[in-house]
């Protein structure tokens, strides 16, 4: 800015690079946001995301006191990788005991340098690899750092007031590290169990201790002021020492170091006097639960055997949609799952499908019936058409086929019958018998036909021959029945053709399977209902001769 320029001279020259514009509005230009008072635990959790350190308000909420000078004991679980503790010790001038078990600490320097009056410190299972920064706690008398990864004890030489030291389950391998503890004149209690120094004096490839090595006697020589070693008086130096560190013990040691989840989920057996236990950054992982048994989810009773795999232990780690680990799904997964579903519906046993009509008598069977059961299927189709509940569905199918045929004929009246015969084939006849059998096949169940009024002998190998021989006789009876009664009118001929058609299909199913053309063209859908009314007048035909 030009220092010689005065505002009274007019506007600033065009060389100015900064312009200031005042806002003409009432009130403060930069109002401060209103602070929200800490209330419930939900507010504490929400504001914890904003605050980057332990503020006095948060310490008051943790200790449940208004005056932080009254706090002497504080226990919390922190994670310095996510939240910084700051210099919280300056707000707790009278803090004597601090318990941070199961926390995640990168270093002791994360605790700050304002805890000079602290006397007892718990840091069990905190993931510590060293003790750098312990010199800030000059008044420390008891230090519990069990089950960490500490191997260097040199920072402890600055603690002249130290009396109790717990190093259980650490990585102290060199007996020479005990020399640093000589500089702690008041050290009386030491715990070294679980360190490699208890087996051998020096680190090496072998995990076997020398025959004449006694770590209790060696530690007593290096730390003469020590009174208790591993909860046993140091005067007892003849205790048998373990000669080999087994792999099971190492596994248990590592499990204890990483067993914070178990301690968090289990209830506390004891609580120190003072501040209530609070967790600054609780991360409670939900334990993995085993899936409930299928029998517990179905209150009706046990499940069918078809729903359960033969070997459930071999497929408990794989989803049913991924075909297990033995097969690889390539290409479009949606298309593959759709094809798999269609294939499963075609080949799966019907025990796995739910009942479609509970009011009808049904029996499960395979989706591909044997040729020997074709007669039962034909009679079942006729009975299914006579069921009142199934008529609307068949009627809709007939209307759909009629609309489709009308649309094709409107486009090309000459080629429509030929194209439909080529596309659908002989299996897509528009007779109600074929539609009824198709309905029973798509629904997955076959209706149980009504029992015959006359006893029939069991089917044998010559059953198909008997049906073929009996076909002319039944045809004559049907023609006679179709000609009786003036009420039938023109529908008698159609009823005769439909009945004969059903008998031909039931007697010789291989005739249509071989692709032979029908002797007569298929009837149109518009004339099908008239023929079906004629079938209501059919009565059971008594056998001409008694069976042997």
Curated annotation (Swiss-Prot):
Domain LRRCT positions: 207-249
Keywords: Cell projection, Cilium, Cilium biogenesis/degradation, Leucine-rich repeat, Repeat
Ranges where the record places region Disordered: 405-433
PROSITE patterns: LRR (PS51450)
LRR repeat windows: 94-115, 117-138, 139-160, 161-182, 186-206
Location(s) in or outside the cell: Cell projection, Cilium
Gene Ontology CC: cilium
Any one biological process term the GO annotation gives: cell projection organization
Main subcellular location of this protein, as a coarse class: other
Pfam families for this protein: LRR_4 (PF12799)
Subunit structure: Interacts with IFT88.
Function of the protein: Required for the assembly of dynein arms.
Family membership: Belongs to the LRRC56 family.
Protein's recorded name: Leucine-rich repeat-containing protein 56
Organism: Rattus norvegicus
Name of encoding gene: Lrrc56
């Amino acid at each position: 800015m030009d220092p010689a320029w005065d505002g009274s001279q007019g506007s600033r020259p065009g060389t100015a690079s900064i312009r200031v514009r005042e806002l003409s509005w009432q009130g403060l230009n930069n109002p401060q946001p209103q602070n929200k008072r800490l209330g419930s635990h939900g507010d504490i959790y929400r504001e914890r995301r904003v605050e980057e350190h332990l503020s006095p308000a948060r310490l008051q909420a943790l200790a449940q006191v208004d005056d932080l000078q009254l706090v002497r004991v504080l226990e919390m679980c922190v994670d310095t990788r996510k939240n910084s503790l700051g210099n919280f010790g300056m707000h707790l001038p009278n803090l004597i005991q601090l318990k941070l078990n199961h926390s995640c600490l990168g270093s002791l320097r994360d605790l700050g340098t304002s805890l000079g009056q602290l006397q007892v410190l718990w840091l069990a299972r905190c993931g510590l690899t060293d003790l750098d920064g312990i010199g800030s706690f000059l008044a420390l008398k008891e230090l519990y750092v069990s089950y960490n990864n500490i191997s260097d004890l040199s920072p402890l030489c600055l603690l002249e007031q130290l009396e109790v030291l717990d190093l259980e389950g650490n990585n102290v391998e060199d007996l020479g590290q005990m020399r640093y503890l000589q500089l702690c004149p008041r050290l009386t209690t030491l715990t070294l169990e679980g360190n490699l120094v208890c087996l051998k004096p020096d680190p090496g490839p072998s995990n076997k201790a020398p025959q004449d090595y006694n770590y209790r006697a060696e530690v007593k020589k290096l730390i003469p002021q020590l009174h208790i070693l591993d909860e046993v008086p140091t005067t007892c130096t003849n205790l048998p020492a373990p000669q080999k560190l087994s792999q099971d013990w190492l596994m248990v040691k590592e499990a204890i170091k990483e067993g914070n989840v178990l301690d968090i989920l289990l209830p506390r057996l004891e609580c120190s006097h003072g501040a209530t236990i609070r967790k600054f950054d609780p991360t409670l992982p939900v334990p993995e639960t085993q899936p409930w048994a299928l029998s517990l989810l179905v209150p009706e009773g046990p499940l069918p055997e078809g729903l359960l795999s033969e070997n459930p232990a071999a497929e408990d780690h794989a989803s049913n949609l991924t075909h297990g680990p033995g097969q690889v799904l390539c290409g479009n997964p949606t298309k593959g799952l759709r094809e798999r579903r269609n294939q499963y519906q075609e080949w799966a046993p019907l025990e796995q499908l739910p009942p479609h009509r509970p009011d009808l008598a049904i029996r499960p069977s395979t989706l591909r019936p044997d040729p020997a059961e074709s007669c039962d299927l034909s009679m079942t189709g006729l009975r299914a058409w006579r069921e009142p509940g199934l008529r609307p569905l068949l009627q809709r199918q007939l209307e759909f086929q009629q609309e489709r045929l009308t649309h094709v004929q409107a486009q090309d009246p000459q080629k429509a019958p030929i194209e439909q015969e080529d596309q659908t084939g002989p299996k897509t006849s528009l007779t109600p018998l074929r539609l009824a059998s198709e309905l029973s096949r798509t629904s997955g169940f076959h209706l149980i036909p009504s029992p015959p009024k006359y006893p029939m002998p069991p089917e044998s190998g010559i059953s198909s021959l008997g049906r073929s021989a009996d076909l002319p006789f039944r045809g004559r009876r049907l023609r006679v029945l179709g000609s009786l009664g003036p009420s039938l009118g023109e529908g008698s001929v159609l009823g005769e053709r439909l009945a004969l058609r059903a008998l031909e299909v039931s007697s010789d199913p291989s005739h249509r399977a071989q692709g032979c053309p029908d002797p007569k063209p298929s009837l149109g859908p518009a004339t099908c209902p008239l023929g079906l009314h004629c079938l209501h007048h059919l009565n059971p035909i008594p056998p001409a001769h008694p069976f042997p």
